Swiss-Prot record:
NCBIfam families: ileS (TIGR00392). It comes from Levilactobacillus brevis (strain ATCC 367 / BCRC 12310 / CIP 105137 / JCM 1170 / LMG 11437 / NCIMB 947 / NCTC 947). L-isoleucyl-5'-AMP binds at residue 556. Its main location: cytoplasm. Its EC number is 6.1.1.5. This is Isoleucine--tRNA ligase. Monomer.
C-alpha cells in the first residue's frame, strides 16, 4: 500500500474541460427525446401562470447577437419561473410579412408582374417559412426551451383571422377612417410607412432663403415688400400654397442700403440673416406681431398664377431660418394641418417612385425629386428671388428597410385614430411597470406626440385590409363583413382575398345601400406589419387557452418603444380597453467593441454560431448575464474569452465539489444541521444568503447581479476560503469521520443548490453536473429552485451577531494572510504549511474566536498556532487593528501524509514519518500498515 492510498482523494468523471460545442448538441438531443419542455409544463399543471409573451423577430436571415441577447434573456426568465412554482409556457413567434421578403424574391429573380398576386404571395410564404426554420434552429442551439413545434407566425390563418377581428373591434369604435394626409412615403418601397418604420440619419440638404413679394398686405405691408422664406427642400416649392408664421413672434420690416426692396423676417433673426445675405446698413422700418400678418397674400416666386396665403401656426420658431416657413399642404404634416384651417388646396406634385409630376410644371415633370432641387434653385435665381443658398446639416427620415430617404406625401390612406383614445391609452399605461423606470415616460411621451396611425400599405405580402367598396365608391366595413372575412381567413388563409372576387368574399345574400345592383370591389392595400405583430395579444394570448391576457411580461430591445410596445398598446386598448402587458422590460442594442453598430458591410459582426462553435452556447448565455443589458452592449471576442475564464472557475469548483462527494450518500451519510461543525454550519448559512439574494435578482430580472454574486460566491466564499482549507479535512480525516461527513454534507448541499441556481443560465452544464448528483429528478430542469428554508433549519437561523462575528474573523484571516505573504517574501517560510503563528488579540477578538468555536489553525492552513493577549505582542510582530501576528518557521518535521510540520512526527513508532493525528487515523482504518509498512511509490 502506498501512503496516498490512505488519503481520501476525490474522484469524478466530470471533466475539467467542458467540450461544450460537442456535448451541448448531445444534451439537446436528449432533451428532445425526453420532451423536456412538455415534461416541465405537465409538472407545473395547476400552478399559477407566468406568461412572457415573445415579441416576434423578423423572419429574414440568420440570428445575430441581438437575437441571442434577447432570446437567452427570455429563456433565463422562463426557466427560472418554471422552477419556482409557476406554469410558464413560452410560445415563440415570428413576424413573417412585409417588404423585405418581397425584395428577397425580387433579388432571386422572380418578376412579380409575370405572375398573379396569389402566386407571388405563395412564394413569399415559402421563403418566410424557410427563414423561420433557419432561425428556429439557431435559437434551439442557444439552448432556448420553448414550444418550438407550435410557434405563432403572423402568416398563420388563425393569427390573420384574429388580426382582422381586432381591426373590426376598432372599426366598431369609429377608430378606422380613410383620409388624404401627408404620410411618410418611401419611394424606394413605393409605399406609405408608419413612424415605427422610419429611422433618422444626419444628411446635408440644399437650404434656400428666398423672397416672395406681397400682393395684398392687408394695410400692414406694402407691395414692394418681400417675405423672406426658408426651406431645406427646394423641390417642394412647386407644391407651396402658403407661408406659415407664429402669431406671437415679432416680425421686422427692414430695408438694406444695398437693395431696393423691403423684407420681412423675425426681428430676432435680422442681424444674423443680414450678415448671411450680405445686406449693408439695414434699416428697421417697423415691427409687427405675427397675428397682424394673418391672411396677407404674396406671389409665388415662379408660378405666376399662384398666390400664397400667410397663415398662423404653432410649429414656427426662431431657432433657425427666418421665422417664416414655406408651406406645401400635400408634402408635409404640419403644412397639411395648418393648410386645412385655411382651406388651401392639397397639391402632390410627386409620384409613387419619387418623380415630379406635371402638377409641378413642365420644367419639373419626370425629374427625380432630389434632382428637382437644382431646378427650383435655378428658377429662384432667374426670378431674382434667391437671397442665399447654403448646405444645411440636419436629421432626416429614412426607410429602415431600404436605407433610402423618405418624403412626406399626401395620399389616400387608411388610418387608425390614436387621438380618439389617447387619454384612454395613457390611463392604462400608468398601471404598467417598466424596467428601466424611464421606459414609462418614454412610451407615454411617444403616445402623446404621435399622430393617427397610417395602417395601409401599398404592397401585397401582408394581411389585406378587410374593406369593400360599393358602387358609389363608399367604403363598407360592418361587423358582418369583417367577421365573415375573419372566418374565411381562419379557414383558408388570407390568400383567399386575392383568389376570389369581392362578391365571393362577402356573406351570402349581403346587400348594401351603396350597391343597389349588388356590385362590389375590394381594397387592394394590406395592413402595416406593425398592425400584424401589434395584435399578437389577441392572435396568441387570447387565442390559446393555456396562455393568459394580459401578459405578465414583454421584453424587447429599446427600439420597440416606437415599435411593438407601441403598436401592441394601441391595438389592445382600442380592442379590449386594457394594456396587453403588466410589465415591460427593455434592453439596449448590441454594438461592436468600439461602440459602433454591427453590420456585414463594415465587417464588424460576431455571429452567435461563431462563438458557439468554438466555446459553446453556455458561454454565450453566461455572457448575457455579465452585461448591463438595460443599456447598449458591446460585443467582442475578448469579452467571450473573459467569460470563458469565469466559466472555467465555476466548472472547476463544481468538479471539486463532485469529486469530494463521490463517496457521500446524502441519504445515509448526511449530518444533521445541529451536529454540523461550526464552519460548515456557517457555510450553509452563507449558501442560504447567497440563494436568497440570487433568487431576488432573478425575480427582478437583474442578471448582472446574479453573475456578480455567482462569481463572487465561487471565487471568494468557496475557492478562496472554504475549499482552500478543505483538503486537510476531506483528504486527511478518516473517510467516515463526523468532521469529514459534516463538510461533505455542506459540499453536497452547495453542489445541489448551486446547480439549481445556475440552471436557467447554464442549462447544458447544469444537466451535466446533475448526472453526478444523487437526486430524485432525472433532469435538473424538472427540479425546483432551492427554497431558503430548505438550506437552514428554521429553528437554526443564526442570530444577528453571527455574520458580524464571521466578518470579524475574515478580517483577521486577511491580516494573517498578509503576514504569511511577508514571511514568504522574506524567505522565512516557503508556504503557509511551514509556518507557526502567534496571534495576539484583544478581548473582543478572543471572545469572538471562542464564540465561533472553529479550528483556526486548520482554516489558516498553518502547522502551529498559539493565541495570546494583544498586550503581550513582541515589538517585531506585525500589527493590525485588534491583532498582532508573528510568523515563525514551524518546529518539527514534515508529515509524509498531511504535509504539515509537526513536532510529534514519529511519536508512533509504526509510522515514523507520520504526525500523531495521521498515525492514529491510519492505524484505525488501515491496521495492516502498522506491520506491513508502505510501498515507496
Amino acid at each position: 500500500m502506498r501512503v496516498k492510498d490512505t488519503l481520501n482523494l476525490g474522484k469524478t468523471k466530470f471533466k475539467m474541460r467542458g467540450n461544450l460545442p460537442v456535448k451541448e448538441v448531445d444534451r439537446q438531443k436528449a432533451w428532445a427525446e425526453n420532451k423536456m419542455y412538455e415534461a416541465r409544463q405537465k409538472l407545473n399543471e395547476g400552478k399559477p401562470t407566468f406568461i412572457l409573451h415573445d415579441g416576434p423577430p423578423y423572419a429574414n436571415g440568420p440570428i445575430h447577437m441581438g437575437h441571442a441577447l434577447n432570446k437567452i434573456s427570455k429563456d433565463i426568465i422562463v426557466r427560472y419561473k418554471s422552477m419556482s412554482g409557476f406554469r410558464a409556457p413560452y410560445v415563440p413567434g415570428w413576424d413573417t410579412h412585409g417588404l423585405p421578403i418581397e425584395q428577397q424574391l425580387t433579388k432571386a429573380g422572380y418578376d412579380r408582374k409575370k405572375m398573379s398576386t396569389a402566386e407571388f404571395r405563395d412564394l413569399c410564404r415559402e421563403y418566410a417559412l424557410k427563414q423561420v426554420d433557419q432561425q428556429r434552429e439557431g435559437f434551439k442551439r442557444l439552448g432556448v426551451s420553448a414550444e418550438w413545434d407550435n410557434p405563432y407566425l403572423t402568416l398563420k390563418p388563425e393569427f390573420e383571422a384574429a388580426e382582422v377581428r381586432v381591426f373590426g373591434e376598432m372599426a366598431k369604435r369609429g377608430l378606422i377612417y380613410k383620409g388624404k394626409k401627408p404620410v411618410y412615403w418611401s419611394w424606394s418601397s413605393e409605399s406609405a410607412m408608419a413612424e415605427a418604420e422610419v429611422e433618422y440619419h444626419d444628411v446635408t440638404s440644399p437650404s434656400a432663403f428666398y423672397g416672395e413679394q406681397v400682393v395684398d398686405g392687408k394695410g400692414v405691408l406694402d407691395t414692394d415688400t418681400y417675405l423672406v422664406v426658408w426651406t431645406t427642400t427646394p423641390w417642394t416649392i412647386p407644391g407651396s400654397e402658403g407661408i406659415t408664421i407664429d402669431a406671437g413672434i415679432e416680425y421686422a420690416v427692414v430695408k438694406p442700403a444695398n437693395d431696393d426692396r423691403k423684407f420681412v423676417l423675425a426681428a430676432d433673426l435680422v442681424d444674423q440673416n443680414a450678415e448671411m445675405f450680405g445686406w449693408e446698413d439695414v434699416q428697421v422700418i417697423k415691427t409687427v406681431m405675427g397675428q397682424d400678418l394673418d391672411n396677407v397674400t404674396a406671389q409665388h416666386p415662379f408660378i405666376a398664377d399662384r398666390k400664397l396665403v400667410v397663415m398662423l401656426g404653432d410649429f414656427v420658431t426662431t431657432e433657425s431660418g427666418t421665422g417664416l416657413v414655406h408651406t406645401a399642404p400635400g408634402l408635409g404634416e404640419d403644412d397639411f394641418n395648418v393648410g386645412a384651417l385655411y382651406h388651401l388646396p392639397v397639391l402632390v406634385p410627386v409620384d409613387d417612385k419619387g418623380y415630379m409630376t406635371a402638377e409641378a410644371g413642365a420644367d419639373f415633370a419626370g425629374v427625380f425629386y432630389e434632382d428637382a432641387n437644382q431646378i427650383a434653385l435655378d428658377k429662384l435665381k432667374a426670378a431674382n428671388a434667391l437671397l442665399k443658398y447654403m448646405p444645411y446639416e440636419h436629421s432626416y427620415p429614412f426607410d429602415w428597410r431600404t436605407k433610402k430617404p423618405v418624403i412626406f406625401r399626401a395620399t389616400p390612406q387608411w388610418f387608425a385614430s390614436v387621438d380618439k383614445i389617447r387619454d384612454e391609452i395613457l390611463a392604462q399605461l400608468k398601471d404598467v411597470k417598466f424596467q428601466p423606470d424611464w421606459g414609462q415616460r418614454r412610451l407615454a411621451n411617444m403616445i402623446k406626440d404621435r399622430g393617427d396611425w397610417v395602417i395601409s400599405r401599398q404592397r401585397v405580402w401582408g394581411v389585406p385590409l378587410p374593406i369593400f367598396y360599393g358602387e358609389d365608391g363608399e367604403a363598407i366595413i360592418t361587423p358582418e363583413t369583417v367577421d365573415h372575412v375573419a372566418d374565411l381567413f381562419a379557414e383558408y388563409g388570407s390568400n383567399i382575398w386575392f383568389k376570389r372576387e369581392a362578391k365571393d368574399l362577402l356573406p351570402d345574400g349581403f346587400t348594401s345601400e351603396h350597391s343597389p345592383n349588388g356590385e362590389f370591389t375590394k381594397e387592394t392595400d394590406i395592413m402595416d406589419v406593425w398592425f400584424d405583430s401589434g395584435t399578437s395579444h389577441q392572435g396568441v394570448l387570447a387565442e390559446r387557452d393555456y396562455l393568459d391576457f394580459p401578459a405578465d411580461l414583454y421584453l424587447e430591445g429599446s427600439d420597440q418603444y416606437r415599435g411593438w410596445f407601441n403598436s401592441s398598446l394601441i391595438t389592445s386598448v382600442a380592442a379590449t380597453g386594457k394594456a396587453p402587458y403588466k410589465q415591460v422590460v427593455s434592453q439596449g442594442f448590441t454594438l461592436d467593441k468600439d461602440g459602433h453598430k454591427m453590420s456585414k458591410s463594415l465587417g464588424n459582426t460576431i455571429a452567435p454560431d461563431e462563438i458557439i462553435s468554438k466555446m459553446g452556447a453556455d458561454i454565450v448565455r453566461l455572457w448575457v448575464t455579465s452585461v448591463d443589458s438595460s443599456a447598449d452592449v458591446r460585443v467582442s471576442t475578448e469579452a467571450f474569452v473573459k467569460i470563458s475564464d469565469s466559466y472555467k472557475k465555476l466548472r472547476n469548483t463544481m468538479r471539486y465539489l463532485l469529486a469530494n462527494t463521490s463517496d457521500f450518500d446524502p441519504q445515509t451519510d448526511a449530518i444533521a444541521v445541529d451536529d454540523l461543525q461550526p464552519v460548515d454550519r456557517h457555510m450553509l448559512y452563507q449558501l442560504n444568503e447567497f440563494a436568497k439574494s440570487v433568487r431576488a435578482h432573478y425575480d427582478h430580472y437583474d442578471f448582472l447581479n446574479i453573475y456578480k454574486e455567482l462569481i463572487n460566491f465561487v471565487v471568494s466564499d468557496l475557492s478562496a476560503f472554504y475549499l482552500d482549507f478543505a483538503k486537510d479535512i476531506l483528504y486527511i480525516e478518516a473517510a467516515d469521520s463526523p468532521v469529514r461527513r459534516s463538510m461533505q454534507t455542506v459540499f453536497y448541499q452547495i453542489a445541489v443548490s448551486l446547480t439549481k441556481l445556475i440552471t436557467p443560465i447554464l442549462p447544458h452544464t447544469a444537466e451535466e453536473i446533475w448526472d453526478f448528483l444523487k437526486e430524485p429528478e432525472d433532469f435538473v430542469q424538472l427540479a425546483e429552485m432551492p427554497a431558503v428554508l430548505e438550506l437552514t433549519d428554521a429553528n437554526e437561523q443564526p442570530d444577528d451577531g453571527h455574520q458580524s462575528a464571521w466578518d470579524h474573523f475574515m478580517t483577521l484571516r486577511s491580516h494573517v494572510l498578509k503576514a504569511l505573504e511577508e514571511a514568504r517574501d522574506a524567505k522565512l517560510i516557503g508556504k503557509a504549511a511551514e509556518a507557526h503563528l502567534d496571534l495576539y488579540v484583544d478581548e473582543e477578538t478572543k471572545r469572538l474566536l471562542d464564540q465561533l468555536n472553529v479550528n483556526v489553525q486548520q482554516i489558516l492552513l498553518v502547522s502551529g498556532l498559539d493565541v495570546a493577549s494583544l498586550d503581550q505582542a513582541p515589538a517585531d510582530a506585525l500589527t493590525f487593528d485588534h491583532l498582532a501576528v508573528k510568523v515563525t518557521p514551524a518546529a518539527g518535521e514534515v508529515c509524509d501524509r498531511c504535509r504539515l510540520t509537526k513536532e510529534d512526527v514519529g511519536s508512533d513508532s509504526a509510522y515514523p514519518h507520520f504526525c500523531a493525528r495521521c498515525a492514529a487515523i491510519v492505524r484505525q482504518n488501515f491496521p495492516e500498515t502498522a506491520t506491513e509498512g508502505f510501498d515507496e511509490n
